[in-house]
């Protein structure tokens, strides 16, 4: 298994800290609004990583957090006259619903920052005791990055650009020093009583503390195997996480760092701050979650994905082929490539090489369909073909529906009944040799984007886009 390590900037063999076990931490959302397609892409990318590792024989523990203490949450809660707990719980539920619709496996653990305040305070106290952290006059506590000789080694950032983004605090020793603890500033602020005084943790300390309490190994030079997240988190968030872990515990946070690429809308990075977010819940109004998942996984996870609906509909053809084969093989079958599972898994073991994996998948679908055409009554290999389809489901998280359900997506129960009534009316017309009426019914349904197919078992129908 090979993965691309952001820190080394190259593909490297995956060699876990404990043989055949992988512990992964993925940065989750800050829950002040609904999740957008950028969040979906990150969740799907590392869901693919998890599935690939599991099918390669690894025992995987994947932790994905919720940041439920943050300035954006506080500001929106004040605006909506809610507590931060009320507001964050709304968006945690929304995010969970969205990811369920995208068939993303539930993490082993989903810690909330608010549940680990003691661990955060303890880590800050350690940094103060080591004289690596310092307090300024307003009570805020910062980490002195000059005490970490490896600061910047992960992101290799452009300091003139990135440090300007942090903002200037006059009492900071260095511009890149980052806040560990924000003291309580008054009635419109949120604070928790602690040995550090009333206040709340900074963003970066939250993830490091949750990793330490939920995943970290002892007696190893790294706390976890893989730390993952979106490319926008590389600096300052992941750089600062790595720094404070080295400073507090004397070990590296993660052996490997993995980052997924952006989702662009009109060639601009999609983000809430830019106001061009495409929320998952809105996309799900137009497209089934499996169709969205299939599209978002179709571009290599490190590449930028330029979202457009034309490409989404083109990618749906791949799903159609999977379900068309599944539909055929449930009744008949032919020969298949016996090495299919091995070949597609090897593609994913090469830094999740999805384009190569999808090429193997396309080849299998085409060759199997050709053999079904040549020998439609051969049932000897039915179990093996269905096993291959099941393997696709487990590896890529697609192809898990019944074919009838898939091809009738987007049609309500009452609409289905109307279509069935029309099919029955057409059947009677054909029996009465009124072929003009039968053709008119077919054309009428085609205008509603309903295609009819006559089979030996009767007429079946599909919704098309």
From Swiss-Prot:
InterPro entries xrefs: Cys-tRNA-ligase, Cys-tRNA-synt_Ia_DALR, Cys-tRNA/MSH_ligase, Rossmann-like_a/b/a_fold, tRNA-synt_1_cat_dom, tRNAsynth_Ia_anticodon-bd
GO BP terms: cysteinyl-tRNA aminoacylation
Enzyme Commission code: 6.1.1.16
Sequence motif: 'KMSKS' region, positions: 269-273
UniProt short sequence motif 'HIGH' region, positions renumbered to this chain: 29-39
Swiss-Prot/TrEMBL keywords: Aminoacyl-tRNA synthetase, ATP-binding, Cytoplasm, Ligase, Metal-binding, Nucleotide-binding, Protein biosynthesis, Zinc
NCBIfam families linked: cysS
Protein name from the UniProt record: Cysteine--tRNA ligase
Gene: cysS
């Amino acid at each position: 298994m090979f993965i691309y390590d952001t820190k080394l900037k190259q593909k490297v063999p995956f060699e876990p800290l404990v043989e055949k076990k992988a512990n992964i931490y993925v940065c989750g959302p800050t829950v002040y609004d609904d999740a957008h397609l950028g969040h979906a892409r990150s969740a799907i990318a590392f869901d693919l990583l998890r599935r690939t590792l599991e099918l390669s024989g690894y025992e995987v523990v994947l932790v994905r957090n919720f940041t439920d203490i943050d300035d954006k949450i506080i500001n929106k809660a004040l605006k909506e006259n809610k507590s931060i707990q009320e507001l964050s719980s709304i968006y945690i539920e929304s995010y969970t619903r969205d990811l369920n619709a995208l068939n993303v496996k539930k993490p082993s653990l989903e810690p909330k920052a608010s549940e680990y305040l003691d661990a955060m305070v303890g880590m800050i106290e350690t940094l103060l005791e080591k004289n690596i952290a310092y307090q300024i006059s307003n009570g805020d506590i910062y980490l002195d990055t000059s005490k970490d000789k490896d600061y910047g080694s992960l992101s290799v950032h452009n300091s003139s650009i990135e440090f300007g983004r942090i903002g200037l605090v006059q009492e900071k020793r260095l511009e890149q020093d980052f806040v560990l603890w924000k003291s309580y500033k008054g009635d419109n602020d949120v604070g928790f009583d602690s040995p550090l005084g009333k206040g709340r943790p900074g963003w970066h300390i939250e993830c490091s503390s949750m990793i330490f309490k939920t995943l970290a190994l002892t007696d190893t030079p790294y706390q976890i195997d893989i730390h993952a997240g979106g490319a926008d988190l590389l600096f300052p968030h992941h750089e600062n996480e790595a720094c404070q872990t080295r400073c507090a515990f004397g070990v590296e946070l993660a052996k490997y760092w993995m980052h997924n690429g952006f989702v662009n809308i009109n060639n601009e990075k999609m983000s809430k701050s830019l106001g061009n977010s495409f929320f998952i819940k809105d996309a799900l109004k137009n497209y089934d979650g499996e169709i969205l998942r299939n599209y978002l996984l179709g571009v290599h996870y490190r590449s930028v994905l330029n979202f457009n609906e034309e490409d989404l509909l083109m990618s749906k053809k791949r799903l159609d082929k999977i379900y068309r084969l599944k539909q055929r093989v449930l009744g008949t079958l032919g020969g298949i490539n016996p090495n299919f599972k091995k070949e597609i898994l090897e593609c994913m073991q090469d830094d999740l090489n999805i384009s190569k994996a999808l090429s193997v998948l396309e080849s299998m679908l085409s060759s199997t369909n050709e053999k079904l055409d040549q020998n439609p009554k051969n049932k000897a290999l039915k179990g093996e073909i269905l096993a291959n389809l099941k393997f696709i489901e487990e590896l890529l998280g697609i192809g898990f529906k019944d074919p009838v359900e898939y091809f009738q997506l987007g049609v309500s129960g009452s609409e289905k009944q109307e279509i069935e009534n029309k099919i029955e009316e057409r059947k009677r017309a054909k029996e009465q040799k009124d072929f003009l009426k039968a053709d008119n019914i077919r054309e009428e349904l085609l205008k509603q984007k309903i295609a009819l197919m006559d089979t030996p078992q009767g007429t079946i129908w599909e919704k098309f886009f």
